[in-house]
Amino acid sequence: MDYDDLINQAMKQVINEENKLQHVNILIAGKSGVGKSTLINAAFRADLAQTGMGRPVTKEIQLIEKPGVPIKIYDTVGFELDKKVQKRTIKEIKKLAKEKRKNAVPDDDIHCMWYCVSAPSDRFEDIEENFINDIAALGIPVILVLTKVFSKEAATQLEATIRLLKPKIHSVVQVLAKDSELVPSFGIKELVEETCELLPAS
């Protein structure tokens, strides 16, 4: 899959023609081991999600970007979902969102959050739902990304379970960001398209 063509065709068209934005700013969060780094690397077509590759924005958040790619990702570093870290992360996100909105420049806003859940884990905890709802309350729409989808049947069952809880999410996207031995990668295009739907109107 040519991610560069995929992103440039699906996203740049929306950005340039409809919104006049230069970048889509995405917050990404999730437990350790859910595949955030693989997802980020797939979006950028490069191994950027490594220690030291991002630029620190706050203690809990780092910015990952690549010249020529119309995406900026704010990665919640070390987000382990315990109450203390969750509270601190929410505080930092609120501060970041408010600072961006002060500029009154849509290009600076946080346009959405990708919240990642590992499909094979078959778990979605109350603390995750609360975190998502807190982010949505800031006016940041949330796309729930089911990662590591080696079995679409199992992922669909988990998605149904999550939807019954009615978290404040815009949509759910199933993704396998990197080819496995048996299953080719998929879902990045759909994730990009869902993200484009959340961009502000011009």
Predicted regions mapped to residue ranges:
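Conserved G1/Walker A P-loop phosphate-binding module
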Residues: 1-83
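Flexible, glycine-rich phosphate/dinucleotide-binding loops
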Residues: 35, 57, 122, 151-152, ...
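Active-site-proximal flexible loops/turns
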Residues: 48, 82-85, 125, 154-155
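Conserved phosphate-coordination/catalytic loops
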Residues: 55, 87, 126
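Conserved NTP-binding/hydrolysis module of P-loop NTPases
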Residues: 71-97, 190-194
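Short loop/turn segments at strand-loop or loop-helix junctions that form parts
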Residues: 74-79, 116-118, 173-178
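Conserved C-terminal guanine-recognition region of P-loop GTPase G domains, centered on the G4
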Residues: 91-170
